[in-house]
Design a protein with these regions (language model features):
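Prokaryotic Sec-type signal peptides and long signal-anchor helices
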Residues: 4-5, 66-69, 158, 184
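Active-site HxH/HxHxD metal-binding segment of metal-dependent hydrolases
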Residues: 1-37, 59, 125, 129
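Catalytic core of the metallo-beta-lactamase
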Residues: 20-117, 176, 187
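Homeobox/homeodomain signature
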Residues: 8-13, 19, 35, 57-58, ...
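Residues at the C-termini of beta-strands that transition into short coil/loop
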Residues: 13, 42, 149
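Accessory terminal helices/loops
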Residues: 88-98, 107-190
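Short N-terminal secondary-structure initiator segments
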Residues: 2-3, 11-12, 83, 99-101, ...
Length: 190
């Protein structure tokens, strides 16, 4: 497709086939009248980036495999600390930000999240809602940052119910990065 049409393909400085517009943190670009800002989000991979737009008061974030509805990406090249920092960066965006992630893993992520926070009513309600949507072949995405802050355990490592569950399961007490690391490793084997 790139051979036939002149398309701009934005991406990090890496040897990724097809990228012809290299961007990094705080770079801006415009596509079809929408201004985007680049946010570096290492963790899943070392050069992972996202595209954020305030979009006239209706903010959107394309975050690839950093944040998923109800979960987050695996750590392939980066570190747990980098991923935790990237998720914290996302959590500071406006609460009405629509989250467009790279995959529809919502239902399995919510099953895990319920294991972590079985008494989280908003989480249980979202699980039922996603089951219903998927039963009608409807996507559960995009999510919103406000929703994720209420249901996503990877954005809730500072919440006592998440900390207590990790401490109970792994007999450890740690800071948020240690909680996040234990949580991500648990999800890897869930």
């Amino acid at each position: 497709m790139l051979d036939k049409k002149k398309l701009d393909v934005y991406g990090p400085k890496n040897n990724i086939n097809g990228i012809n517009k290299i961007v990094s943190e705080l770079n801006h670009f415009n596509i079809i009248g929408i201004n985007f800002e680049v946010i570096e989000m290492p963790g899943h991979t070392l050069d992972h980036i996202g595209f954020y737009s305030f979009n006239d008061g209706s903010p959107i974030l394309f975050c690839g495999d950093t944040l998923f509805a109800g979960g987050c990406g695996r750590i392939f090249e980066g570190t747990y600390e980098q991923m935790h920092r990237a998720l914290n960066k996302i959590s500071k965006l406006p609460k009405n930000t629509k989250i467009y992630c790279g995959h529809e893993y919502t239902l399995s992520n919510l099953k895990f999240a319920i294991e972590v926070e079985p008494n989280n009513e908003k989480l249980k309600d979202e699980y039922v809602n996603v089951q219903r949507l998927l039963s009608f072949d409807k996507p559960s995405l995009p999510s919103t940052l406000e929703k994720e802050l209420n249901i996503n355990p990877f954005l809730r490592c500072h919440i006592p119910s998440v900390q207590n569950k990790i401490n109970e399961k792994f007999n450890t007490i740690g800071d948020e990065i240690e909680i996040f690391t234990a949580l991500r490793k648990w999800k890897d084997s869930f």
